[in-house]
């Protein structure tokens, strides 16, 4: 089976003084999260679409989905304390409600990347069915500088650098085995789901993203996103 998992567990602290997590803020006439869910409901190959959100916001999430979304494949799941616990909460839901077969895959995506295209979703599905793990990236435009203690320690070759986006897609059993193989210290250091597999020695394939598949994190991002929606309408 092919699952989608929309990670909506963030608190949105970098958005500033706002009354709710950023995924629930309005973008034009509806919440950011709804824009994202709609993109995934267009893909008929998904057997289920999980929206994983903070426990305190489950009722709100269910209410807005009921208002805007009619697709019965969409289910709300309680997330965890951080990104990767939220990811694994979705995996546990799949295990409990559907069982997990050897060829089951999951396409995971940030709730606050509402401009994902059907091409990116399709490329993730095709790639993850052929590979064990897939990351969506765009080539780095600016030079990447590594530093410590206010000093430059390395300047990697830019042509080898990419900026990570989502979706990040996985064979579910490989993801579970990779996560369980990590130490507590490794799990605590995770800032990216694909790192679960790379730390466990699994190869991660690349899918080309798009510059406008950006993450709405700050007030500036929200203004840019609002301008894009207005232009498209």
UniProtKB/Swiss-Prot annotation:
Q: Does the keyword Secreted apply?
A: no
Which InterPro entries does the UniProt record give? Answer: IspD/TarI, IspD/TarI_cytidylyltransf_bact, ISPD_synthase_CS, Nucleotide-diphossugar_trans, TarI
Positions binding CTP in this chain are: 7-10, 80-86
Spell out the residues of the site Positions ribitol 5-phosphate for the nucleophilic attack. 158, 215
**From the UniProt record, which GO molecular function terms apply?**
2-C-methyl-D-erythritol 4-phosphate cytidylyltransferase activity; D-ribitol-5-phosphate cytidylyltransferase activity
Which branch of life, at top level? Bacteria
Q: PROSITE patterns attached here? A: ISPD
- Which Pfam families does its entry note? IspD
Name the Gene Ontology biological process terms.
cell wall organization; isoprenoid biosynthetic process; poly(ribitol phosphate) teichoic acid biosynthetic process
Keyword Cell membrane appears in the UniProt entry: no
Which pathway does it serve? Answer: Cell wall biogenesis; poly(ribitol phosphate) teichoic acid biosynthesis
The site feature described as Transition state stabilizer is recorded at 14, 22
Per its record, the protein catalyses: D-ribitol 5-phosphate + CTP + H(+) = CDP-L-ribitol + diphosphate
Q: Give the Enzyme Commission number.
A: 2.7.7.40
Q: Which UniProt keywords apply?
A: Cell wall biogenesis/degradation, Nucleotidyltransferase, Teichoic acid biosynthesis, Transferase
Family named by the database record: Belongs to the IspD/TarI cytidylyltransferase family. TarI subfamily.
Q: What does this protein do?
A: Catalyzes the transfer of the cytidylyl group of CTP to D-ribitol 5-phosphate.
Full protein name: Ribitol-5-phosphate cytidylyltransferase
Q: What is the lineage of its organism?
A: Bacteria, Bacillati, Bacillota, Bacilli, Lactobacillales
Q: Which gene encodes it?
A: tarI
């Amino acid at each position: 089976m092919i699952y989608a998992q929309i990670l909506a567990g963030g608190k949105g602290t970098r958005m500033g003084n706002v009354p709710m997590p950023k995924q629930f803020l309005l973008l034009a006439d509806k919440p950011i999260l709804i824009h994202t869910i709609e993109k995934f409901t267009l893909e008929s190959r998904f057997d289920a679409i999980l929206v994983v959100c903070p426990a305190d916001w489950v009722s709100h999430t269910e209410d807005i989905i009921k208002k805007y979304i009619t697709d019965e494949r969409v289910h709300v799941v309680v997330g965890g304390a951080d990104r990767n616990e939220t990811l694994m909460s979705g995996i546990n839901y799949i295990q409990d409600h559907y069982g997990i077969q050897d060829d089951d895959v999951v396409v995971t995506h940030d709730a606050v990347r509402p401009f994902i295209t059907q091409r990116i979703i399709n490329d993730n599905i095709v790639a993850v069915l052929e590979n064990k793990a897939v990351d969506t990236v765009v080539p780095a435009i600016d030079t990447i500088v590594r530093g410590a203690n206010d000093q430059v320690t390395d300047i990697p070759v830019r042509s080898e650098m990419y900026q990570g986006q989502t979706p990040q897609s996985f064979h579910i059993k490989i993801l579970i085995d990779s996560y369980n193989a990590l130490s507590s210290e490794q799990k605590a250091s995770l800032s990216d789901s694909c790192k679960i597999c790379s730390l466990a020695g699994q190869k991660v394939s690349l899918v080309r993203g798009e510059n406008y598949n950006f993450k709405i994190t700050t007030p500036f991002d929200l203004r840019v996103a609002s301008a894009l929606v207005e232009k498209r309408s």
